[in-house]
């Protein structure tokens, strides 16, 4: 066997490989000898079929299998000897001319092919003990707890019928019957009876609720609205519609008193128990926000300290995933790049930079995990599947079966677990200091989150 490197540019390598016909023929003959004891051919006793006869019948198919296995074994040897860590699947180019292929399959010609591959660069890891990471922490105040309970009370408030002749106001709940049309034609899903609409809740399409202000019981109005351009039903998105709407009842919200009795309606012993429950929930939310901030800061530090050329094909793959998502979202919403105060060229440049960062960070985290023997156990993955199933009540078995039969989906669950374990490993070594911040500062949006 002869191996010649024909290309070595950065992370890209290409080799021309030549395997003598005699070597292939010997391997194929060995397969045929093994096959002799397994096949049944009329006129021959089991195990007594001459190899030469088998070669006439199965020779080309066995040679094809031999070539396939030889290429895989040879490529593995080439990459192992050179210490390559592959970034992509090897791209093998075989002879295509029919006459040449026939000679190779017949054992009359050497096999010559090329294999191109892109490799992962050698990564020198930083000393994580030199990392300083700020951990923002916000205190949960009594006002935060009271605000959370008020939101809960508002969501559970009851309504009482308004006085006869009273008109609907913002905040009222109006029971309506409606029939929607587009250009005078009714459409699927456009009809409803006994539907409760809380004016100002913004749960219906824009303009629908506002036009109910001032309506009375028994009154019919024609509400003129436009479906949003990003409406889920593409057949309705962006279209003008009219809803012939009749109010059958109008109710006003009753003030919900937050006391022990309210807590009992939620299955709790007292208001104090409710406050403790809400404080615990807020603690979970605050801790999660802190975790995200710390993780983002750590990833920024890893980005700063690990600058290298990432495999172009991986960057292209990551960019294409993001760009296709961006384009689909913009097409759905009807927005243009001008609406975002940018151009398509600038947006592409920005997302390619993000793709490069994501690929590099992925390689760095993988290198850290590999060198420190960080793994994800089957139990950890199973717990993640169980949590996902619990988040979809009534569909638990469907979710469980989906992940059991879908290795790719299971890998997508495993990846964030692995990433978090690597992050925790680094944080154990880094110098992490707490910083008191306000709730608003802790939960503020970070414009750069998409780069994480």
UniProtKB/Swiss-Prot annotation:
GO BP: 'de novo' cotranslational protein folding; cell division; chaperone-mediated protein folding; protein transport; protein unfolding
Subcellular location: Cytoplasm
Record remark on domains: Consists of 3 domains; the N-terminus binds the ribosome, the middle domain has PPIase activity, while the C-terminus has intrinsic chaperone activity on its own.
NCBIfam families, sorted: tig (TIGR00115)
Catalytic reactions on record: [protein]-peptidylproline (omega=180) = [protein]-peptidylproline (omega=0)
Naturally occurring in which organism (per UniProt): Bradyrhizobium sp. (strain BTAi1 / ATCC BAA-1182)
InterPro entries: PPIase_dom_sf, PPIase_FKBP_dom, Trig_fac, Trigger_fac_C, Trigger_fac_C_sf, Trigger_fac_ribosome-bd_bac, Trigger_fac_ribosome-bd_sf, Trigger_fact/SurA_dom_sf
Protein name (record): Trigger factor
GO cellular component: cytoplasm
Residue stretches making up the PPIase FKBP-type domain: 171-256
HAMAP family found in the cross-reference section: Trigger_factor_Tig
EC numbers on record: 5.2.1.8
